[in-house]
């Protein structure tokens, strides 16, 4: 029969401690502090002076962490212990420890009012150390007679074996594997100390993943499964730029943490220009990390669909064109064929000597096909067009509010998985989703639809950059806008040092980036809420001073209505902030200073090459949600 000393020597040490062994009489009557998370077992005999070993275990039913202190003596007889707090204060009830005939078991008997509660502690010769609460002698006997069941060290469920370095259940094994393989990034809504057990393990993925890693599950084990051994090859000089990436930290909390690190495939630091040939196009698409984040009220409405990328929308348009018999030139057919093949970027078309005018003609072809399809399937389209023409001469009174709760909620679902290295594809895809969401938001406003197709398209063409900039400010935290802009500036500086860009070009783009950053920061400082963002967008959308608009007086009335509702909301919601409305409205002129062409280069050239956003706006406004919602990103939590 093994002694307690032999058993204790096998316990995995987490810390060594000399624990005070006083408070013998008080400890037998004191109650356990319910708020204490960690407790200790201390020998109650004042004359016992032996070293002790400490192991932290977790009660799977309560999730409470318990420190078990085992006395190292040679007697092997029952010993009396006391449950105390980690600092030795607030002693609790007495525990009697005895060794079972089985060499791998030590029982800690806790007397209480309901009877004898048995705390069964398994020693390390059994693979999983754990505590089981046995309420009576019968259950104790049953537990001794049946084979010992291993418990998951993460949640306390029945373990299926050792996975990635720790004994876990199938659920925690799969969760850890998915999290590491896809490099998922979670957030904790609490204080990062959530209880993780069999019943609550799915409530906080962040704390569950942290617990997996803290209890010995190794990320490297999963990485080795999915990452093949790479054979070192000699790369030619012309492909060096395409293999460079920007490393982005996932725990960014401030602009100081947004410093980017440039590495190549062999992890050798070097720099390159992001702004040559449509700026960011030369960065390789790479890496996997995930972050699905939800902002604003959790309402599933028409304007909150999970939006696909700009390239996928164009692909959807090309697929629609296949159903029409419209004659096309060889150039247009080649472009449409390239789109239909599922290419994720149109930048390749520019590299294949396809000019922007040819791409634009292909879009014009798609527009004609869509118009033909609409005319053949909807007999009411002519009626809608005639009604729209009436608006050129008649001002329509708008009944009810301009915006309702559907238009206040503004949810952006980020691309998933998030890349380990910030790259052009992730930046452009994130921006395209924000652009789609802004377009779809505008289209969902009934007053906007009443303007007619041509007028509504003209409005969006004139103000899409303002709507996009407001969306960037609203989603700045979700998109890590500061990090993206910091990467832009860093690469601009490197490009200028290597004479890849003229100083005038660098200054122009840098000024634009700083204006955008200043605008986003000012909106964050004002703590603008969802209602205020919605009304600011409406005021920017219904601007009657853009050239080429028809029925300007009606558009002006819509803007006035948006302003009046905005004023009413701010007055009622922030009665003590007298100048809040003025401060918010004074941010709008800064949007007019944003250069739309530079915004296109920075955020969209990586997906659509030299195609201008203005040429794509009509198709986005004309499409149904189902047409560009083909890729379900997943529900944001």
From Swiss-Prot:
SUPFAM superfamilies: Glucocorticoid receptor-like (DNA-binding domain), Nuclear receptor ligand-binding domain
Keyword DNA-binding found: yes
Positions of NR C4-type zinc fingers: 152-172, 188-207
GO MF term (any one): nuclear receptor activity
Subcellular location(s) of the protein: Nucleus
Residue span, NR LBD domain: 383-624
Pfam families named in the record: Hormone_recep, zf-C4
Main location: nucleus
Keywords: Activator, DNA-binding, Metal-binding, Nucleus, Receptor, Repressor, Transcription, Transcription regulation, Zinc, Zinc-finger
Task performed by this protein: Orphan nuclear receptor. Binds the IR7 element in the promoter of its own gene in an autoregulatory negative feedback mechanism. Primarily repressor of a broad range of genes. Binds to hormone response elements (HREs) consisting of two 5'-AGGTCA-3' half site direct repeat consensus sequences.
Name of the protein: Nuclear receptor subfamily 2 group C member 1-A
Native species: Xenopus laevis (African clawed frog)
């Amino acid at each position: 029969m093994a002694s307690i000393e032999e058993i204790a020597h096998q316990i995995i040490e987490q810390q060594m401690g000399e624990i005070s062994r006083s408070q013998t009489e008080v400890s037998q009557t004191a109650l356990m502090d319910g708020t204490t998370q960690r407790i200790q077992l201390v020998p109650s005999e004042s004359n016992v002076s032996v070293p002790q070993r400490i192991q932290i275990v977790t009660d799977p039913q309560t999730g409470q962490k318990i420190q078990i202190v085992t006395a190292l003596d040679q007697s092997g007889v029952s010993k009396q212990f006391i449950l105390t707090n980690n600092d030795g204060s607030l002693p609790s009830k007495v525990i009697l420890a005895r060794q079972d005939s089985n060499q791998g078991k030590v029982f800690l008997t806790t007397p209480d009012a309901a009877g004898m509660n048995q705390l069964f502690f398994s020693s390390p010769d059994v693979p999983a150390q754990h505590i089981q609460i046995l309420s009576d002698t019968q259950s104790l006997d049953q537990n001794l007679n049946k084979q010992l069941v291993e418990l998951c060290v993460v949640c306390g469920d029945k373990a299926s074996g050792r996975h990635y370095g720790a004994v876990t259940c199938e659920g925690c094994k799969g969760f850890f594997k998915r999290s590491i393989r896809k490099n998922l990034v979670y957030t904790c809504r609490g204080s990062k100390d959530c209880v993780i057990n069999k019943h609550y393990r799915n409530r906080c993925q962040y704390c569950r993943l942290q617990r997996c890693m803290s209890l010995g599950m190794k990320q490297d084990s999963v990485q080795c499964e999915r990452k093949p051994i790479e054979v070192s090859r000699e790369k030619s000089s012309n492909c060096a730029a395409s293999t460079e990436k920007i490393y982005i930290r996932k725990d960014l909390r401030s602009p100081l943490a947004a410093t980017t690190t440039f590495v190549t495939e062999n992890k050798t630091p070097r720099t390159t220009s992001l702004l040559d040939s449509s700026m960011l196009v030369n960065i390789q698409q790479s890496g996997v990390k995930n972050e699905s984040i939800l902002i604003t009220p959790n309402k599933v409405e028409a304007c909150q669909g999970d939006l696909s990328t700009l390239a996928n929308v164009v692909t959807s348009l090309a697929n629609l064109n296949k159903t029409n018999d419209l004659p096309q030139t060889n150039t247009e057919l080649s472009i449409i064929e390239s789109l239909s093949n599922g290419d994720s970027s149109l930048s390749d078309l520019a590299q294949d000597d396809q000019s922007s005018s040819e791409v634009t003609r292909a879009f014009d072809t798609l527009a004609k096909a869509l118009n033909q399809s609409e005319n053949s399937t909807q007999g009411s389209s002519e009626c809608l067009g005639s009604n729209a023409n009436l608006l050129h001469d008649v001002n329509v009174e708008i009944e009810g509010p301009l915006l309702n709760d559907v238009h206040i909620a503004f949810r952006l679902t980020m691309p998933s998985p998030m890349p380990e290295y910030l790259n052009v594809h992730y930046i452009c895809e994130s921006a395209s989703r924000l652009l789609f969401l802004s377009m779809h938001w505008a289209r969902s406003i009934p007053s906007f639809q009443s303007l007619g197709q041509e007028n509504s398209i003209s409005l969006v063409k004139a103000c899409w950059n303002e709507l996009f900039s407001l969306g960037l400010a609203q989603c700045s935290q979700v998109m890590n806008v500061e990090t993206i802009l910091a990467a832009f500036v860093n690469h601009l500086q490197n490009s200028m040092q290597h004479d890849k860009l003229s100083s005038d070009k660098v200054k122009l783009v840098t000024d634009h980036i700083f204006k955008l950053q200043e605008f986003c920061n000012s909106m964050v400082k004002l703590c603008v809420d969802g209602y205020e963002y919605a009304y600011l967008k409406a005021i920017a959308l219904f601007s009657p001073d853009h050239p080429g608009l028809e029925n300007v007086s009606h558009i002006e009335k819509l803007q006035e209505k948006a302003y009046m509702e905005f004023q009413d909301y701010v007055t009622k919601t922030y009665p003590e902030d007298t100048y809040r409305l003025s401060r918010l409205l004074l941010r709008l002129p800064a949007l007019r200073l944003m250069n739309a062409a530079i915004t296109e280069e920075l955020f969209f050239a990586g997906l659509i090459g030299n195609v201008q956003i203005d040429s794509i706006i009509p198709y986005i406004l004309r499409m149904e949600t189902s047409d560009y919602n083909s890729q379900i990103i997943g529900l944001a939590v």
